[in-house]
Amino acid sequence: MALTIEFSRRSTTQLQKILEFYDERNGSPDYSRRLLRCLLEGLQRLAQTPTASSPSTRPDVRFFYLMGFTIIFRYNRKRLTVLSISSSARKPLKLYVKQ
């Protein structure tokens, strides 16, 4: 059974900025729509098998690479919460590294 997918405020803001960047760069929302659809489809597959992702240094946080993006999330028996979405071409996020 697939988990319910939720987005944190941070990941929602990050996703909006990513989509706006591609809208401006391409002069059209077409690519952004396709990108969003592919990201959501990937998250739906991830919600079915969240352990098919990579563990982080924190036991409750995992990450997944999809279409050039790093998706950081946590999950429990009922939901998968997307914590962050960033371009894999950027510096890796250090927000979820156990200190």
Kindly give the residue locations of the regions a language model identified.
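Arg/Lys-rich, positively charged N-terminal/basic patches that mediate binding to nucleic acids
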Residues: 1-36
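GIY-YIG nuclease signature motif recognition
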Residues: 11, 39, 73
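Enriched for short, Lys/Arg-rich terminal
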Residues: 66-69, 74-99
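Short, glycine/charged-enriched secondary-structure capping and boundary segments
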Residues: 20, 61, 96-99
